[in-house]
Regions:
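Acidic/polar, glycine-enriched structural segments that form the non-catalytic walls/loops
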Residues: 1-172
Length: 172
């Protein structure tokens, strides 16, 4: 997930933390522009990790404990990624012991670094292309003029029950 923040010169300043109500083991710093939170969902259950990175133009990005800080930037891009052991083979997960959460965080960080190497505009264009492939498959055209618009809804429904048509009823 990518979030682009922009404001007048030097006005983007944010402090971001990853948090979860319960069932997390660790939070901290991965590097000078990435923080993480990791944990598990109980004994012998899925383990997970999530990371948040930032890149800024005209400002500073740094970590302070488990907080990611952007100060005095013209714009900033936040990159969020998460992963769990759900999609990995049990043998792979077993080979990561006792560092499962760290390995997940490393995998996420690699993906975030690849995303950060690209310009925001390119990421947005790719997202819009992917989105269109899923959501531009259906079109809905509603009538411009409605002959029955002044009629009460119950009368319009009764006309349909009686075999009539009312294309504008879909707008309701």
């Amino acid at each position: 997930m990518v979030l682009h923040l922009r404001a007048p010169k030097g006005k983007v300043s944010v402090e971001v933390m990853l948090n979860r109500a319960k069932y997390f083991d660790r939070t901290g710093k991965v590097n000078d522009h990435t923080i993480y939170l990791s944990g598990n969902l109980g004994k012998n259950a899925l383990e997970f990790a999530m990371c948040l990175s930032a890149k800024a133009k005209g400002g500073r990005v740094y970590t302070m404990g488990h907080t990611l800080v952007v100060k005095g930037a013209d714009e900033a891009v936040l990159y969020f990624g998460a992963d769990s052991t759900f999609r990995y083979a049990s043998a792979d997960v077993a080979s990561w012991e006792p560092r499962v959460q760290e390995v997940l965080a490393e995998k996420i960080t690699e993906k975030l670094e690849r995303a950060m190497a690209r310009e925001y505009g390119g990421l947005l264009a790719e997202h819009e292309k992917d989105y269109r492939e899923f959501y531009d498959r259906v079109a809905l055209s509603l009538p411009e003029k409605e002959e029955n618009a002044a009629l009460p809804t119950d009368e319009r429904l009764q006309r349909i029950i009686s075999g009539g048509t009312d294309e504008g009823l879909a707008k309701l």
